[in-house]
A protein has these predicted regions:
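Extended, charged coiled-coil/helical-stalk scaffolds used for oligomerization and assembly
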Residues: 1-139
Length: 142
């Protein structure tokens, strides 16, 4: 496997785990000298310490412009995961009965946010409810 693909795999696995656990990614100080560099960098470091393939290609051994650890790359991978998850939900739905649930509320910084959920009957006849996402709502007044 190419070094790029191995780095990408390590980043994707790290991101998937953090998403499944509902943990934040970034730290306040991600410099190499920092003791707490954030969950993403810390978990990627742990993976590289325990997997010889990853340890050969991540961080210092990766080219400076291709470490696949920047916030932009993290967001791109997160968006790809979200698209694949939505696709899996739609396949599970199988074109059956569904409802869209929407609820808005102001977050801690007083910005309006809307949660979108999908309730549907899956292929097994079970009622499922899945969060599709949380979106910023610029104005709640018509």
């Amino acid at each position: 496997m190419s070094a790029y693909r191995t780095r990408l795999e390590a980043s994707v696995e790290t991101i998937r785990w953090l998403l499944l656990q509902g943990l934040p990614f970034r730290g306040h100080d991600e410099k190499e000298s920092s003791l707490s560099r954030g969950n993403f960098v810390s978990l990627l470091t742990l993976l590289s310490q325990h997997d010889p393939e990853y340890s050969k290609v991540v961080f210092k051994l990766a080219p400076g412009n291709c470490q696949l650890t920047s916030p932009v790359v993290q967001k791109d991978i997160i968006n790809a995961c979200a698209k694949e998850t939505t696709k899996a939900i739609l396949e599970d739905m199988n074109g059956g009965f569904f409802a869209i649930l929407a609820d808005e509320s102001a977050d801690i910084s007083d910005k309006e946010q809307m949660a979108l959920c999908l309730r549907y009957v899956n292929k097994k006849g079970e009622v499922c409810e899945r969060l599709l996402g949380v979106v910023h709502v610029p104005n709640t007044l018509l």
